[in-house]
Amino acid sequence: MAPVEHVVADAGAFLRDAPLQDIGKNIYTIREVVREIRDKATRRRLAVLPYQLRFKEPLPEYVRLVTEFSKKTGDYPSLSATDIQVLALTYQLEAEFVGVSHLKKEPEKAKVSSSIQHPETALHISGFHLPSKSKPLQEAVDRGHAADGPENLEFSSFMFWRTPLPNIDRELQELLIDGREEEEEEEECEDSDDDGGGWITPSNIKQIQQELEQCDTPEDVQVGCVTTDFAMQNVLLQMGLHVLAVNGMLVREARSYILRCHGCFKTTSDMNRVFCGHCGNKTLKKVSVTINDDGTLHMHFSRNPKVLNPRGLRYSLPTPKGGKYAINPHLTEDQRFPQLRLSQKARQKTDVFAPDYIAGVSPFAENDISSRSAILQVRDGMLGAGRRRLNPNASRKKFVKKR
């Protein structure tokens, strides 16, 4: 297995202690990945790495491109800001050393196409026998015994599609033959078990662990990403980038996602929607889908009962608040929200070369910390104003009501 020329490592590669020096020649990452690692054992390994770890920040245009692509695949809510930067760095290295002609600009969307295949008759109805095709009466007469008149025609044709009576002697011979074959198979299995084939024993456990820890890399790969995050792997595969596996954790195929309303059962491929476009309720759930050979859509539902658990959905709404910086719960799709702009003092920029510049008390830029927007940590529209999107993987504080 030849090592890859350029490898981008995620936090999962360091946490799993992946042998990156054997996987790639040049190892890249971003500083936010190292800051995410908190446990002592991993930080000690990072202090004495047997290879050079290169820190490189992705360009803004690649971050924007990966963000838009992840929104179309439906993995954007599952990705943090650090994950998007790692994906953007992989895309940037692929563009620098290989090119972007083979990469996809749009993911494969799942579309519902009607199938023209319909059963001719209803099947498996208890108490009724429905033949697949109606046979002509003349054919039934030719195959059966010769009938003297038209009166016996119905009974002669009936004998051909009814269930024949079982032959006891033939079934007994088949059971005896099957029993002998099963005994021979059991003896062969016992002989193979004695050899230890297929079992994990103390003698071959280290060899099996080495095979599982190997990174399965395709041939002629210049740039790859080592990550254990399935959402990141799905985005990489749909873009056409290479995913390097650690401990066998690799997405076998790229999945497409849709949003399905569990209130009216309507589906949509627009993954940015929060409310259902048909009934207007906040009842959309992400469902993975695959397209069959005949064009029909196959949805994969989760068996976990917590997916549709109604606990915590009924609660008292707070009193609506007014004002420029009011934050009210988002209840409807057409609900209007304030723009949440920065204060005028914070929006001012200090440009000493401007013709209208007047030197004040200090030539340095002023940092607004006393206004209402600064206290609420409001950012401008160009910097992600409104409802800021935080890290979905960060731990949330649980507020316990004191008695």
From Swiss-Prot:
Record's keyword annotation contains Transcription regulation: no
EC class (word): hydrolase
Keywords attached to this entry: Endonuclease, Hydrolase, Metal-binding, Nuclease, Nucleus, Phosphoprotein, Zinc, Zinc-finger
Enzyme Commission number(s): 3.1.-.-
SMART domains associated with the record: PINc
TM segment ranges: none
Residue span of region Disordered: 180-201
Gene3D superfamilies hit by this protein: 5'-nuclease, Nin one binding (NOB1), Zn-ribbon-like
Classification via Pfam families: PIN_6, WRNPLPNID, Zn_ribbon_NOB1
Oligomeric form and interacting partners: May interact with UPF2. Component of the small ribosomal subunit, ribosomal RNA processing complex (SSU RRP complex).
UniProt record similarity statement: Belongs to the NOB1 family.
Role summary: May play a role in mRNA degradation. Endonuclease required for processing of 20S pre-rRNA precursor and biogenesis of 40S ribosomal subunits.
Protein name per Swiss-Prot or TrEMBL: RNA-binding protein NOB1
Organism, scientific name: Mus musculus (Mouse)
Gene from which the chain derives: Nob1
